[in-house]
Amino acid sequence: NIPNGSGLSSSASVEVLTGFILRDFFGFDVTNQDLALIGQYSENNFNGVNCGIMDQFAIAMGKKDHAIFLDTADLSYTYAPIHLSGAKIVIACSNKKRGLGDSKYNERRSECEEALRRVQKVKKVENWGALTEAEFEEIKGAIGDEVLERRAKHAVYENQRTIKAVAALQNNDITLGVPPAASSG
């Protein structure tokens, strides 16, 4: 019951579900990770959204009572247990429609990629996820554009918040995991 256009990965859910159905019906020899990659390919090439792998991967590789910590650069991942201790996760539908094809997602991603190209001219950086906040602050001047710098900063800082949230989950600390998500910009 995922509302279409709600920002809850409805298209990725349909892509992965379709893959599961076809695999099971026809007996295809493909892994869940393969199905995630096929879903991403479909989104990129047929829906026109230059999305990453995160949504499809989380759906295809999800594990009950766990979060997935995914390195999208090489698809390595670990599971982080979620012990809610009586707390509840609530997802509310605002009824505000959202579609990545109509959003600024492709533009934002392109801006992050351009910022990375500029930084790579002066420093070997594979991707924004490879940097700490301090490392970003040292090299951000190479970007040379305020908007591109903001986009890159968001990518780096968001990745660091994710790392901190995973550490909190691994320590059964769900309260420490909340502030990083709440500070996302």
Model region roles, listed by residue range:
Residues N1-I82:
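Gly/Ser-rich oxyanion-binding loop with an adjacent helix/lid
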Residues H66-G185:
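C-terminal nucleotide
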